[in-house]
Amino acid sequence: MRFFLTFLLFLFTLFSLFVYDFLRKKNFYLDLDLDIRTRTVKELILNLERFFGLNLYLNFKDIKFEKIIKIEKGKVVVVSFKKRKKKKKFLLKNIPIREIPINLKIGHLDVWTGNEGGVNRVIVKDASLINNELEGEFLYTNLRSFTLNGSIKAKIQRDTLTLKDLLLDSEYFSAKTKGEIKRNTGEILAEVEIKEIRKENFTLSGTKINAKGTINLPVLDINAKAFVKDLIVRNKNYGSIEGIVKGNYELFDKLFLKGEAVNPEGTKIKFTYDVIPEGLLTFSFENLVVDKNTLGINREIRGEFHGNGKVDFKKMFVKVNAFTENLEVIDKKFKGDVLFSYNFSGNGSLNFEFKNSGYAKGNLIINKNKLEGEFSFNDFPVVFQDFNAYLSGEGKFKKGKIFEMEAKIFANNGQFRDFSLQRISSDVKIRDKEIEALVYYGNSFGFVKGKFDNLKGFIQLNNFSLEGKEKSIKISHGSIEFSIQGKSINSKGKLGDLALNLSNIYAKTELEFNFNKKNEKITLEGNGILNVRFKEKSVLENFKYSLLLLDNNLRIFGASKDSILRVVYYISGRSGEFYGKIDKKEFGISLNGEIKNKDVKANFEAFYALLREKIKIKGKIETKEDQVKISLFPTQLRGKRFNYRFNGLNVFLEKENLSVEFKGLDVSLLDKKLLSISPSKGVGTTKNFSFEPVKITGVLNGVLNIAYKGNLYLKSSGTLNLTLLSKHIGSLMKSQMFGKLDYEFVFDGNELKFLARNDEPVRINSLYFYEPFGSAMNLELRKDFFAFALTGWFREGFLNAYAISKNFRDFEVEFVYKNLPVKLKDGIRARIEADGKGKVVVKNFKEIFLTLDTLLDGYVKVKKLPEKKEEEKKTLPVEITLDINFKTENGLIVKLPEGRVYTALNGRIYGKLPEPYYEIDVVLKSGRLEYFGRKFFVKRSTVKLLKEKDKELTEFDFYLNTVSDGYKIFLLVHGTPENPSVYYFSEPPLSREQILFKLISGGVNEGILPVGTVLANELKALGYVKGTIERLFDVNVEIGIKTSSTGEVGALVKLKKKLGSYFSLYYQTASTKDKKDTFWGAEVRSPGSLDLGFSFNVYSDNTREYKLRYVREFDF
């Protein structure tokens, strides 16, 4: 205690004699509250102004002088008000590290430092220096809101400072440092992590840096390695960057860094940074890829840039040069460069130029608060979000106190999303807050003029169109007027023939509307006529509708002959009701319900016509807060061919939780069970959902798995029982199949795969072939691909067919066959062996092309030819074009009702159905036919059938001969069916009449060839024969022909002899088979005016017939 007081007295004496007078001149202030008894300084205040360019303020409280000096609380403020003069170079060759003989604890110390560069603050907490071991926590902040938390553990031992743990943590990075420092050497290791940065279009993942510092005074050498996993600019990831940094730091004099970084894409960046004393950063880059992902657009653009730049922090200047040799925009490549310079005083410039077959160039001058620039384009592809086009034009702008711009721009070959655009031209002028713009789009145009808060304009539409892949928007004509005043908008318009075409949906409407918005009040009125088609089927036709939004009430009404819509919604009350119905022959749907707040209740009913039956479903929909319930009620159908029983379906959704209960389905065809699908339940969320395995039995036997994980997933495998299927549809197909197909089905989002094949041969009995055959089938179905292969083998023949499609609208089918045993029925029976090949091409389900080359041999039996019926020409749903070439190799045996002929064919059928052209030559090589009970032998005869654009005919030449009573008779029947003629002669020669009587002496069989008919018609030439017989025998002769109901044609000869005035005898003979055509009889007539007669006939079958006739005239 005595030593402590003596030491304080000594210090006070020195302070009074030597220091006080000097400090007093420096505005020195000292306030000391000392408690000598407890060796405690309760408070120490020191204020010193203009002390070597510093203002210094200290305030310490509760300083206790014990074995460990304790400072409970303190504050230090140091403010510099003089600029430092450049000092001479100072080399620190060693650090005065030595053990400190005192122990110290500080509870809270607040240190403030400030100069013209800013203010810094360090708060030290719970710091201690005991036995040369240092521990403590600190918090650093500055006026830029940068905050750094830290803690330190270190130890001083002799001349060595061991840094056990220095931990730093901030919003942007954290670090962990260890090391050992001696008087002139040392090593420091640091692990630094740059924290993740996420901005709107920029993401930098957490970056790790491992650094090592080697001290060899006066120099500190720095080596660091860094790895950046993700560096994302919009949708482009420049990540997986590896970099190294090297440098050296001469304490208080120089700091120099250099480094480089590279990523897997080949981008390389190098830099040098002279931090002290020059403050100069230079850098270069290579292969910096800029593409559609970098720019966040949906159009192809890509370029690799290289360049260099520098930043001079002393002169406050930045300059960057960038170049590219291959900027690919849409379908063109450009060379170009970009030059940017700027000094921090506010002056700078930007120049760019890209050129090839087209070009884009421009310049911008920055002069503090003024901007001035110009630009020009020529056939330059421009991409902005979902819009791209080739631009030509020029413009200029400047901004000082006001903004001014003039530009004329033309856009060709434009595209917006999937739509192709017509030519666009624009002329725009802006001055201050006023704009005047004229825009042309194809034959349409628009104009706007006024201040930005008071605009008026109009749009005139003429053949406006947006064309896309399988979709389009077209407006034949229309006009729209609009004005904008502050928050008020007024618009009215009329659109004629607004047509929307989306794949299978086509909608067309005419619309008139008025729209007004004033503050928050909106009025909308419109009406029109709507037509909608789905897959060429009419859904809505001449649907007249109107809508009205007035006083927060929305009303929509619409109707046509088979549909109706009614919606009423009260916006202020958040309630309404709706009703809609479509009632077509093929399908129908009705829906009615109500809306209250966000809750909806609706009942619906729908049907679809399938196999001449109506498949119906009924159900209801309910929504309440976060819940949605959908129920399909059980329904059943018992039709003539098709039956089903649907047991119901329930869907429940609450927020994202989803559950489904499917209660099963049974399907029957022709009263036979076709398919059963077992009940199943599914649970999950709207993002992840799955069903219990669904069992399928019947014609299909297998298991179906259903799941949803971002995409719908379906998987099924099993067998298709063709034997069972034939029992259901065999009568329709006129075939029976015996066997099965193994199938596999997978659907995963947009990917579809269906495979089916048979391991064992499938046996087929078909009415179209006169022998059963075995077959192999292979089917492959994918999202944009279809293929089917069929091989059939017979005893001596085969059939191979292959079908393929790449878009499910266009198909190609190729087939080849040999010794194909074809069988025909329905009036013409045939057993034909055919060799050939062919192809069927289907285009968009609207056109079918069939080409076929085939050889025919075999046997044909014709009972009768189908009668031609005159029907109205019907338009086929598709256009079918034929090109069929056929001929016989060995010939065809044709069995007709009148006999048998051996024929050869050669022909072509071509053109479009239902009236194709044809050219067919038929040769009857030989044969035997029977007419009038007589056999005729066929010699080489021909038939020619021809139909061309302006010509249609059938010509024939039949050569026949027969033998009668030792006479050979030769016939030639030739001509056309409408005008046939016959030529005949005999050996030995007979007269024409004699030949005919010999030919028709027997009966006539029904025939296909026109021989019998021609001969019967030839009897009309016998008129003069009749007269000769009447004169020779004094009898009345009648000659004629008769055609029976069966088609039999024969000759009739009737002789009649009068015996007096009232009695006659007669005799009739015929060449037909009918017994009633040959008879004899007598007739008696009364004398005078009384018309009374009696006759009898005795037929060839000995039956008799008696007739009494009385005729009397009455005068009324």
Curated annotation (Swiss-Prot):
The keyword Endoplasmic reticulum does not apply. It comes from Aquifex aeolicus (strain VF5). It is found in: Membrane. The chain crosses the membrane at residues 3-20. Disulfide bonds: none annotated. GO terms for biological process: protein secretion. GO terms for cellular component: plasma membrane. It is a single-pass membrane protein. Keywords: Membrane, Transmembrane, Transmembrane helix. This is Uncharacterized protein aq_2054. Pfam families: TamB. The keyword Transmembrane helix applies.
